[in-house]
Every structure is written in structure tokens, then in C-alpha cells.
């Protein structure tokens, strides 16, 4: 992946749908933004939520780069997040349900090998290895439990577990992971290896490909762009308006609820003195959508509303 493609796709990821994501967060968990139990005002909390979302989007994009490369090598990614119900054990009233939540799963077959018996590579992704003793033990045990489930699902395949840390500068628990793997390997129980940074791509003999991505990441960081730090205006953002028009009825009723917390939301994020506020536009457009007999009538009424708004400007 060349840098121009990297930056273009990252720019798109960091600027698409930001207002919509923020709107959903506010509706689903208003107490995070309006609560007497936290000292910050709503603007600070909105900014925190927005920047946290941007950071998560950034990491997801880095994961996407890895997926892109792996598929370019000819591997097919399989479903990596799902729930699996274990067989009911004696004495249990209900069977245990395990959530498999890997970053990637793909088959790794030898040259000329059979797809059905190919090794199943299961990748767990973390930003950096900074965990304390209790945390790392919990992380290890959770991954092992998921790998045991995957061995049930793929009884004819070897399960290869991998914990990949993106940041190559922190190796706090490398000895712990190596010791656990050696012990598990000797008893032929499911285990996983820890890899750091470009080391993971040695599996494909393509370490230089990830080193190139790491260089792209550093170049983007050193450019000090700030366009993705500006929080969208929920009162005027076009994507937010479209999201409001298409909100399910439960979420919409929350947003227009007379409850104090939602009244505060409307007061702070919408300009209730402006008839062109997204709030009032959404009210009108949702009504048109609800009462129109067909798509043609809906389009006609929306056009009439837009023409009327233009005449009043």
C-alpha cells in the first residue's frame, strides 16, 4: 500500500459519519454527557467522546491495513466474532455461552494442501503490552477459552493462536507469554504466541510490508494534521440530519422525550431558536416519510419543503 492510498483512506475513515456516531452515543447513554456525578460540562464530555471515537477509528484503520495485506497474500478472512454455546455439563441448569471475539481468523494451508484441513490462524489484536500480572492472566485465560471453543468447531484443523501487539516498543509480558506457550505446546493444549509490530508478518515472510505501513503511520503522525480533531456541528451536519430522519422509533422518542436529560440534550446540541435546526428539519421530514403514500409523494413533498425553505432565506 503506497502512502497516498494510505492517507486518502485514513482521511476518509476519520471524517465519515462522525456526527452520526456521536448522536447515537448521546441518545443511548445520555448520562455520560449530562450527570451531576461527573465534574465536566457537556461540551467537555462531548469532546472526550468524539476524540475517543477518532482514536478507535484510527486503530481500526490500522487493523484494516493488516486485513488488506493478508487478503492480498491470498488468504480468505472468516467470521471472527460470534457466540458459541457449549454442551450442557452434568449439574448445569443452563449451557455456558462463550463469545469468540478475535480480530481475524483465516486458513493457512501448505502448498498443495487441502483447504478443509488447513491450519486455522486466530489473531487477537491489542495496541501494546503494558498489562499488570492480574490483567495479563485474565487476558491469557480468556484467549485460551476461546481457542478451546474453536478447536471444537474445527476438530480436523490445527488451531494457531496469535496475540499481536501493534506497538513494538513495549514487551512487558513477553516472557510470560513464551512460558505459557511452551507449557501448553508440550501438553498439546490450545495455546498462542505473542508477536510485536512487524514481527507478526514474518509468518508470511512479508515483514517489510508492515514496516512500510509503520512508516506510513509515522509520516501521517508527523504531518500534524488537525482536520479530524474538529467536532461536527450536530445542529447543522447533513449526515446527522439523515441519521435523525432514519432513527428507529425507540431512539427517536428518546431524543424528543420531555425527560430532563433529553430536554438538556436538545437545548445544548440544537439551536431551538432556528427553524433550520436539524431538530426541526427532522421533525418535518420524519412526518413526511411517515404519512406519504409512496416514494413519489415523499419526494414531491420534500422538494416543496426545500423550495419553501429557500424562499424564506
Regions found by a protein language model. Name each.
Residues 51-55, 88-92, 108-111, 146-151:
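Short secondary-structure capping micro-motifs at structural edges
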Residues 58-62, 97-98, 135-139:
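Phosphate/oxyanion-binding active-site loops and adjacent basic polyanion-contact surfaces
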Residues 71-97:
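A short acidic/basic microdomain associated with nuclease active sites
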Residues 157-313:
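Domain-level recognition of nuclease-like catalytic cores that cleave nucleotide substrates
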Residues 96-122:
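Active-site beta-strand-loop-beta-strand hairpin of nuclease catalytic cores
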Residues 113-121, 125-187:
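Catalytic cores of nucleic-acid endonucleases
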Residues 83, 107-109, 128:
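Beta-hairpin (beta-strand-turn-beta-strand) motif
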Residues 1-74:
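Interdomain/boundary linker segments immediately adjacent to catalytic/signaling cores
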Amino acid at each position: 500500500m503506497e502512502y497516498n492510498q494510505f492517507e486518502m483512506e485514513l482521511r476518509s475513515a476519520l471524517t465519515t459519519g462522525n456526527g452520526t456516531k456521536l448522536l447515537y452515543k448521546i441518545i443511548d447513554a445520555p448520562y455520560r454527557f449530562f450527570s451531576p456525578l461527573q465534574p465536566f460540562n457537556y461540551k467537555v464530555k462531548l469532546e472526550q467522546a468524539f476524540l475517543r471515537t477518532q482514536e478507535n477509528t484510527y486503530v481500526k484503520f490500522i487493523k484494516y491495513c493488516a486485513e488488506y495485506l493478508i487478503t492480498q497474500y491470498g488468504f480468505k478472512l472468516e467470521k471472527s466474532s460470534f457466540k458459541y454455546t457449549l454442551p450442557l455439563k452434568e449439574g448445569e441448569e443452563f449451557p455456558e455461552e462463550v463469545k469468540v471475539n478475535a480480530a481475524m481468523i483465516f486458513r493457512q494451508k501448505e502448498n498443495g494442501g487441502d483447504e478443509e484441513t488447513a491450519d486455522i490462524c486466530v489473531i487477537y489484536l491489542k495496541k501494546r503490552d503494558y498489562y499488570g500480572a492480574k490483567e495479563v492472566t485474565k487476558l491469557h485465560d480468556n484467549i485460551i477459552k476461546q481457542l478451546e471453543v474453536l478447536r471444537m468447531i474445527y476438530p480436523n484443523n490445527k488451531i494457531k493462536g496469535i496475540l499481536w501487539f501493534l506497538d513494538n516498543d513495549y514487551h512487558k509480558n513477553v516472557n510470560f507469554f513464551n512460558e505459557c506457550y511452551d507449557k501448553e505446546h508440550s501438553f498439546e493444549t490450545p495455546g498462542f504466541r505473542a508477536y510485536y509490530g512487524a514481527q507478526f508478518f514474518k509468518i508470511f515472510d512479508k515483514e517489510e510490508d508492515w514496516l512500510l505501513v509503520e512508516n506510513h503511520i509515522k509520516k501521517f503522525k508527523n504531518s500534524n494534521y488537525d482536520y479530524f480533531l474538529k467536532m461536527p456541528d450536530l445542529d447543522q451536519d447533513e449526515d446527522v440530519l439523515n441519521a435523525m430522519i432514519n432513527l428507529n422509533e425507540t431512539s427517536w422518542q428518546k431524543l424528543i422525550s420531555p425527560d430532563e436529560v433529553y430536554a438538556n440534550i436538545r437545548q445544548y446540541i440544537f439551536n431551538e431558536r432556528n427553524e433550520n435546526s436539524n431538530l426541526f428539519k427532522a421533525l418535518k421530514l420524519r412526518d413526511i416519510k411517515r404519512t406519504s403514500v409512496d416514494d413519489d409523494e415523499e419526494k414531491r413533498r420534500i422538494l416543496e419543503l426545500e423550495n419553501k425553505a429557500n424562499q424564506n432565506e
